[in-house]
Amino acid sequence: MACPALGLEVLQPLQPEPPPEPAFAEAQKWIEQVTGRSFGDKDFRTGLENGILLCELLNAIKPGLVKKINRLPTPIAGLDNTILFLRGCKELGLKESQLFDPSDLQDTSNRVTVKNLDYSRKLKNVLVTIYWLGKAANSCASYGGTTLNLKEFEGLLAQMRKETDDIDSPKRSIRDSGYIDCWDSERSDSLSPPRHGRDDSFDSLDSFGSRSRQTPSPDVVLRGSSDGRGSDSESDLPHRKLPDVKKDDMSARRTSHGEPKSAVPFNQYLPNKSNQTAYVPAPLRKKKAEREEFRKSWSTATSPLGGERPFRYGPRTPVSDDAESTSMFDMRCEEEAAVLPHSRARQEQLQLINNQLREEDDKWQDDLARWKSRRRSASQDLIKKEEERKKMEKLMSGEDGTSERRKSIKTYREIVQEKERRERELHEAYKNARSQEEAEGILQQYIERFTISEAVLERLEMPKILERSHSTEPNVSSFPNDPSPMKYLRQQSLPPPKFTATVETTIARTSVPESIASAGTGSPSKIITPNTVPMLTPRPYSQPKNSQEVLKTFKVDGKVSMNGEMAPGDEEGKEKEGPAAAAPGPSLTKSQMFEGVATVHDSPVQVKQGSNSIEINIKKPNSAPQELTAASEETESNGQEDEDGEERPGTGDLEPDSAEPQHFTTTVTRCSPTVALVEFSSNPQLKNEVPEQGQKKPEDEMSGKVELVLSQKVAKPKSPEPEATLTFPFLDKMPETNQLHLPNPSSQADSPSSEKSPGSTPFKFWAWDPEEERRRQEKWQQEQERLLQERYQKEQDKLKEEWEKAQKEVEEEERRYYEEERKIIEDTVVPFTISSSSADQLSTSLSVTEGSGTRNKMDLENCPDKENERRQKTPFQENDGDSLLKTREGGLPEEQSLTPSPSANPEISVSKGIHQDPQLEAEAGAPHCGTNPQPAQDPPRNQQIPNPPTSTSEDVKPKTLALEKTINHQMESPGERRKSISGKKLCSSCGLTLGKGAAMIIETLNLYFHIQCFRCGICKGQLGDAVSGTDVRIRNGLLNCTDCYMRSRSAGQPTTL
């Protein structure tokens, strides 16, 4: 703390004294030995600047004193470490006045105003702290390393004593008993406790050195927040007064008199009862402080002593316990001594120095404030995230009440609305698909992600029938008006029928008068040039312009029909709908011409049966539309199932009552009901059968939309020559009626199309091979059956193994139980005999059991065959608990008296060989024959459960004698009878019996767990070991801890309805 007496020797230029080399060398050597690290080519200040060596020195003296060392190569990191070092020194017992300032180690080479003298003084402050730390380490019990040689510091101490003598004023008196004694006594007397004393209200506002390092006064905090700077207790503020040499010098503080302090409390600037009017707001305080600084700078400059302030507002209290060594403000530069105190040049020089110091300090404070604001913002972000996480946990666990909890849980209406929205999006994407692969990918992706109402459909692979359904059913693509669009998806995901084929069509023109062609129809009468157009051209995913209106809900004769089930009149009802949708517009392309739905303009449908072809006539009625009754009259089918997938043709029964019919011929090959419902046998020998023998396949119930529609239900013909009439709206607009020709390969020569006009032009177009398609469908179905069979077999084997394992464990449990009972009976001293009274008691209890077991009797009589088989398989059953059954079915009365009552001892009466858990029975599909599984709470488990079909043999071990059983019944208390009920249950996780240990039972869901098996199904964490209870959620049959449940909720995994 070298400080020359500027006030006494103002005319002599000061030369910086060389630092005491022995003290530097000893301090450096001691630090290197203790820490094991070398300074290298760095000097003393540079080696200690980052504070890492100092912190490691403290940890070597007392391990764990500095928890975290900041090793970043920044000045702020060094300041952090230095502050941690000074804090650790306090914990070792060093006092405030023995510590250097954190800024004493900063690099001041680039500062203009800091001279060599100030640099030397700061290093001496560091050496003094090392000296006291060495003394503390020598007395520390946990330190056993190298001791600091205190003799090397004698030169430093003597030099500081000399400086103290020079700087001291004549008014002060110090004892001459030695520097160290004076130092220690003064420190222990007036310097050691940080008393937070202040001068008068003007001086002490900014005398930051008088404050405690850890508890800055309120005005600093207020000013730090109002300036935008952090309130920092390690470095000074820019509004600080110019230093007082006598007051601020470290050695002067150590030797100053302990004058009486004013009894001003620490929080004197906070409003309280005693000084409510003395509180000065922070902005006013700052202005006063600034005015006071200028006043003090002038008074200090003109003072004869350089440090004594002549103007005081109140009684002066010297602040001798200043916690700082105030790095940049303590010393005036040596040039000040050469200037006369009263000259104007000296005043200007002082003002210049003051401004430079302010600028440097402002820059330092700005850097520090930026760094602190960065750290503060990062901390606030962390705190905010933590609060959000806790709030989310409270919300999910329901601690904030049900109202907030309900906000995070969707209602059923919201779930349904979201499901409908997903389905609409799926329909749009599916409708806009450009290729078959893309459409199948969209559908498969939806099925994998969401359930389609039936859980079975989730696992079904999509059959490749989309191409056929779109090439022959273009009306199914009109999703938006469909009231229940999911029906189409269900239909698409069902296995396709075995036999399918398409319709090959050609159209030939014939000369018919134009007036007749357009008579009696409601379609637009614009004339179109006749074209020959291919019908049913396979454009799988295109859609006509107006086909959106085709698919609507329809009702025929009071029956509402759904897509999957074709009721009578459905096809006619569909044909009545939307004629404008199927009618092509004025500018029709070839593909649009026949992609509409073939609809009927309220005209009757009749079929004319030929030997190898069917003739469909078109009649355009001039009268009002008639009500169709052909499809609504249902005839009795003979109940046969058409194994070949062929349908006999149905016939209509209505004669048209007006206009001359215009004929066109159709020949239809064999078709699948899912492709078109106009289905006729392609075998010539079947063509001649009676039309009433229309067979209805089961697959027809699953068939979807239709294209060329005839009724599925057939009606008996009322006329000898039935005739079908269809009105095609796209024929109405043509001047000449086109011939619709559907060639049959086997009967092409017999087709009546040869009788038509020679101008008919047949068209060749693409058609898939029905035989190849049939083979593919059969192969697919066989593969599915094989996979199902394998899966079923695996499940059966697994169930069999689990059942046998459970049987063995139950038998082992019962065997041990009876061994214990036998030992207890053998150890009993009281002799037991079977008396007549005991026999009577047994028979009475048996009759009570019979009365309570009537339901068991009824159940067992329902399946006597199985009981006979079971008795033949298990010859040892008389030792088990089915003696009741033997009694009912004519067992010997002697066995009654020796067989224990099932109600008396449920553990004994439960049959060993035939017991099975109800869950296992349900999985194995064992027929129960009306037997109800016994609930877990029912103590008398005397119900006889039949064997599952997978069991081969039971290994039933013989039990103890009936005498011992009888004795056991008489001794047993009702409390003992219930103790092993859970032992018969199987763990839902590992499949083993629960036994007698701790178990977790959720009876409402039929879930049973060993306490060690009660784990989260996702993270496998233990759920049953919490002291304060466990929050368990069961999601899709799987145990979920709170963390995994919240994670799955935030990931958005859907819960099935």
UniProtKB/Swiss-Prot annotation:
Residues 633-646 have a biased composition (Acidic residues). The keyword Cytoplasm applies. Residues 269-278, 472-481, 514-534, 606-615, 663-672, 736-760, 896-908, 931-953 have a biased composition (Polar residues). The keyword Iron-sulfur does not apply. CDD domains: CH_LIMCH1 (cd21278), LIM (cd08368). Residues 251-641 are annotated as: Mediates interaction with MYH9. It is found in: Cytoplasm, Cytoskeleton, Stress fiber. Residues 185-326, 373-412, 468-493, 514-769, 795-817, 833-910, 923-957 are annotated as: Disordered. It comes from the Eukaryota. The modification Phosphotyrosine is found at Y313. Keywords: Coiled coil, Cytoplasm, Cytoskeleton, LIM domain, Metal-binding, Phosphoprotein, Zinc. Residues 204-213, 835-847 have a biased composition (Low complexity). PANTHER family: LIM AND CALPONIN HOMOLOGY DOMAINS-CONTAINING PROTEIN 1 (PTHR15551:SF3), LIM DOMAIN ONLY 7 (PTHR15551). Actin stress fibers-associated protein that activates non-muscle myosin IIa. Activates the non-muscle myosin IIa complex by promoting the phosphorylation of its regulatory subunit MRLC/MYL9. Through the activation of non-muscle myosin IIa, positively regulates actin stress fibers assembly and stabilizes focal adhesions. It therefore negatively regulates cell spreading and cell migration. Interacts with MYH9; independently of the integration of MYH9 into the myosin complex. This is LIM and calponin homology domains-containing protein 1. It comes from Mus musculus. The gene is Limch1.
